[in-house]
């Protein structure tokens, strides 16, 4: 089992902290981390020279300034920041933002996504997927609604005790993926699987709130402990510009093909 697939407690530092990169994980292209600010550390600035960046506000409220414009972020709001544009994040209270980035050759427009107005009631972006015991809500925050080269970002929220990422599927030839877990109250936990062959899984570990898992190969379902949900932010990175930037197009584990993924 590889130790650089699991990153525990990604929220243990304030400021802008890039937790996983191609240098310390199995990722080929994607880097990701957290921006956590409060009244003691209310502002950070970031360079964005050769990469596109996505931001998703997990908790609190803050503002993002890009190119002379300012955008207010609260729960599940998102930002797409193009290559070559620096940005500043400011809060006067508390904000916790998940950041993902990857290199690209192309430049796309800045795009702000308001979760309540743009995503929550949009049937193309909010998907109610599966059935008991694998029911979950998928919110696509940065997806086909936003012009970009490689990155997608959103959240999956399960019912207590349910499976997600079910039926088991994989996309190793086209995309790498991050799962960052949130809102899993203690003593609840989840269990994350990654395997090409179920008889000898590459990864099978309990995961807690603020843990992150990098997925570069294999089927990757997870399950919540009874009475508790398993919720996570996901970030997908296409292995090529403008090629596999989609949530769908996955390979379902043989034997489970009759169960719809609901991914599109």
PLM regions with names:
Residues 49-67, 160, 173-211, 223:
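Glycine- and acidic-residue-biased ligand/ion/polar-headgroup-sensing regions
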Residues 187-264:
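Acidic/histidine-enriched, beta-strand-rich ligand/metal-binding domains
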Residues 43-49, 90, 165-171, 203-205, ...:
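Short histidine-centered beta-strand/loop micro-motifs
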Residues 91, 99-104, 140-143, 155-160, ...:
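Short, structured patches in soluble enzyme cores that scaffold and shape functional sites
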Residues 106-131:
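A gly/proline- and charged-residue-enriched helix-loop-helix capping module
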Residues 11-44, 129-178:
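A short glycine-rich, His/Asp/Glu-containing loop-to-beta-strand
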Residues 24, 31-91, 95:
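Extended, compositionally biased flexible segments
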Residues 70-74, 83-112, 208-209, 217-243:
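Ligand-binding loop in jelly-roll beta-barrel domains
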């Amino acid at each position: 089992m590889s130790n650089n697939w699991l990153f525990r407690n990604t929220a243990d530092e304030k400021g802008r902290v890039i937790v996983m990169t191609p240098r310390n994980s199995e990722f080929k292209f994607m880097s990701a981390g957290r921006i956590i600010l409060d009244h003691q550390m209310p502002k950070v600035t970031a360079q964005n020279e050769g990469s596109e960046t996505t931001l998703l506000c997990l908790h609190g409220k803050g503002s993002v300034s890009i190119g002379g414009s300012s955008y207010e972020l609260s729960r599940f709001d998102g930002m797409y920041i193009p290559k070559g544009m620096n940005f500043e994040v400011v809060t006067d209270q508390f904000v916790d933002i998940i950041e993902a980035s990857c290199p690209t050759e192309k430049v796309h427009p800045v795009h702000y996504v308001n979760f309540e107005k743009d995503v929550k009631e949009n049937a193309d972006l909010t998907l109610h997927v599966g059935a008991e015991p694998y029911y979950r809500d998928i919110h696509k925050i940065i997806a086909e609604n936003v012009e970009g080269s490689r990155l997608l970002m959103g959240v999956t929220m399960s019912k207590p005790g349910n499976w997600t990422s079910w039926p088991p599927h994989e996309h190793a030839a086209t995309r790498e993926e991050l799962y960052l877990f949130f809102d899993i109250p203690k003593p609840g936990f989840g269990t994350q699987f990654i395997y090409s062959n179920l008889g000898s899984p590459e990864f099978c570990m309990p995961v807690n709130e603020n843990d992150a898992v990098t997925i570069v190969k294999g089927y990757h379902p997870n399950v919540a402990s009874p009475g508790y949900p398993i919720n996570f932010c996901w970030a997908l990175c296409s292995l090529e510009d403008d090629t596999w930037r989609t949530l769908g197009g996955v390979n379902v584990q043989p034997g489970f093909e009759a169960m719809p993924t609901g991914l599109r």
